[in-house]
Design a protein with these regions (language model features):
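Short solvent-exposed beta->alpha transition segments
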Residues: 21-60
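Acidic, glycine-rich catalytic/binding loops that coordinate metals and/or anionic ligands
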Residues: 196, 223, 228, 253-314
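Zn2+-dependent peptidoglycan hydrolase active-site motif and core
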Residues: 174-218
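Exposed beta-sheet edge and beta->alpha loop/turn motif
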Residues: 59-107
Length: 314
């Protein structure tokens, strides 16, 4: 009979350094790539600096679950992934870095899609935003679409089966097309194109010397050209899976320079003053963006953690 594991059980085992119990609940593959001695050291380092943990989100989709905790001092965070067999297939324990002086956009923006979407990566720390560790992507967000608890219907190896694939991408604010890259094929979901990580993308120049980037666009779907003036909400292309993308989604960021290598991202000011983060579902209706917190679902990337992620120094 399958043992039922819940959030309280997991975090209690982590806080009490119950290494053997945790290791016994790893999937077979996770055990193969994880040393029990490393796990013991990681837990010891983590518990030496953490505060009192509180469950932040419980997300589940495609028969996988993710639990996320932060401590009351916001100094540490934990993420644990479970598969449909209640086996642990991923564990992340990180100190929370608080970077000061991050600038906010002066321009107000909408999300670049008019369909309801789900924030898979987004926020101001690396536990809920994978991009945070990279200066030129730090405040970016990734958007997917979930229907009936799934990101796709049918064969997960086909881009066309993902709910967000092919949907219209719209301009997030008025601006001028600064740059377009096109002609890069969509990848098979789960197979990343690391040679062209952004895939097909567009850079739009807005007011206040701000730029937006939308990446992983479907090839040959652009409706506009370099130099065109855009209005907020204008259809500019369609969602694809080009570049370093695990499955069809929208990568969106606002930045202070058009050069993607040296730019710094800005904290996006959205209409309605919302601040979407991982686990939020967003709906865009003209001037309004509605946000729903604590949605009971999330996307599980194909290349899920293959080992314990930790940044604690022993």
């Amino acid at each position: 009979m399958m043992e039922t594991i819940n959030a309280q059980i997991i975090i209690n085992k982590i806080e009490n350094n119950e290494v053997q119990w945790l290791y016994n609940h790893f999937s077979e593959y996770f055990q193969d790539v994880t040393s029990i001695n490393d796990l013991e050291q990681i837990l010891s380092n983590y518990n030496a600096i953490r505060g009192q943990n509180h469950l932040y989100r419980h997300l589940h989709i495609n028969r996988h679950q993710e639990y996320i905790w932060f401590d009351n001092k916001m100094t540490t965070g934990v993420s644990v992934f479970l598969n449909k067999y209640q086996e642990i297939i991923g564990m992340t324990l990180v100190p929370i870095k608080h970077i000061r002086g991050m600038k906010q956009s002066k321009q107000y923006y909408t999300i670049p899609i008019k369909s309801k979407c789900f924030v898979y990566w987004g926020g101001d720390n690396e536990l809920i935003n994978y991009h945070y560790q990279y200066k030129n992507q730090r405040l970016a967000m990734d958007l997917i679409k979930v229907e009936d608890g799934c990101t796709y219907n049918g064969d997960s190896n086909q881009c066309e089966n993902y709910h967000i694939y092919g949907l219209p991408i719209v301009a997030p604010a008025n601006g001028v097309v600064e740059e377009i890259v096109d002609g890069i094929s969509d990848s098979i979901p789960g197979e990343m194109n690391t040679v062209h990580p952004e895939g097909n993308y567009i850079v739009i120049k807005h007011g206040h010397k701000e730029y937006s980037l939308i990446a992983h666009i479907k090839p040959h779907s652009f409706k506009i050209e370099k130099g065109d003036e855009l209005l907020r909400g204008q259809h500019i292309a369609n969602v694809g899976n080009s570049g370093n993308s695990s499955e069809p989604h929208i990568h969106f960021q606002v930045m202070n320079d058009k050069n993607l290598q040296v730019t710094q991202t800005l904290k996006i000011q959205f209409h309605n003053n919302i601040a979407p983060v991982k686990g939020d579902e967003i709906t865009y209706n003209g001037d309004s963006i509605l946000i729903e917190k604590e949605q009971p679902f999330s996307k599980i990337a194909k290349n899920i953690h293959t080992n314990i992620t930790h940044l604690f120094k022993g």
